[in-house]
Amino acid sequence: MGDGDSPMCLSAVSFKGIRCWLDKLLLWALTISITLQNAAVDCTRVENNELPSPNLNSSMNVVRMGQNVSLSCSTKNTSVDITYSLFWGTKYLESKRRRGGAVDFHLRISNANESGPYKCKVNVSNLMKYSQDFNFTMAKDESCPSCRLSLLLPGLLLGILVIVLVLAYLIHLKYKKGKKTQREDQSKGSGDAPAQDELYVNACKTQTEQPQEIHYATPVFKEMAPMEEEGGTDGKADYIYSELTH
């Protein structure tokens, strides 16, 4: 009896196996059919310029400076290859390519200006669509010493630079004034020199001139005869004349 039941058991097992295999085949065919239908719908939308706009969001809206954040760009079109591009204002940041779904962009907020706005662009063939703007909110943390230091450091450097420039200007002005005084002193000294030279030349000329010849006179005394004066007087006057001979 056992031998008689064996074919029936084998046939039942083989029937279940075939049925399981057929179920898997049917499920696989159904999945392929749905995928092809979705792809056809997406391609039809693309051909009809019906590319949906992407959505840009983040898991956190309030951030601090120096914090790492992520932005997710997603679209309803999931069956075609899509190029996702991220923009900060009008500045291009990064691009990623995948078949539909969503992509994540990782950023680091270094200053308050990097809070936004951000945009995501999807590109399929010759079609493109932009997402809405997204902005982060900067948290006001008063207990952040590094933040205060980053704000004070530029002002401190600017103050040091101004002091250095003022000192350099004063030193240059003092040096220029001293140089001008030295030039004036030199010009005065050069102005007195010709007068001294002239006096020296005159003195030399006076000393080098030939001395004048000195002539000596020798007196010669002669006795002259007395002369009578008119009017008649008895007195006689004797006169002695002399001549100088050189």
UniProtKB/Swiss-Prot annotation:
It comes from the Eukaryota. GO terms for cellular component: extracellular region; plasma membrane. GO terms for biological process: mast cell degranulation; negative regulation of mast cell activation. The chain crosses the membrane at residues 151-171. Changing Y241F: Abolishes interaction with PTPN6 and PTPN11. Loss of function. Expressed in myeloid cells (dendritic cells, macrophages and neutrophils but not in T-cells, B-cells or natural killer cells) and mast cells (at protein level). A motif (ITIM motif) lies at residues 214-219, 239-244. Residues 52-131 form the Ig-like C2-type domain. Glycans are attached at N68. Disulfide bonds join C73-C120. It is found in: Cell membrane. N-glycosylated. Residues 1-33 form the signal peptide. Its main location: membrane. Disruption phenotype: Enhanced IgE-mediated, mast cell-dependent passive systemic anaphylaxis. No effect on differentiation of hematopoietic cells, including mast cells. Residues 172-246 are cytoplasmic. It is a single-pass type I membrane protein. Residues 34-150 are extracellular. Keywords: Cell membrane, Disulfide bond, Glycoprotein, Immunoglobulin domain, Membrane, Phosphoprotein, Secreted, Signal, Transmembrane, Transmembrane helix. The modification Phosphotyrosine is found at Y216, Y241. PROSITE patterns: IG_LIKE. Immunoglobulin-like receptor which plays an inhibitory role in degranulation of mast cells. Negatively regulates IgE-mediated mast cell activation and suppresses the type I immediate hypersensitivity reaction. Monomer. Interacts (tyrosine-phosphorylated) with PTPN6, PTPN11 and INPP5D. This is Allergin-1.
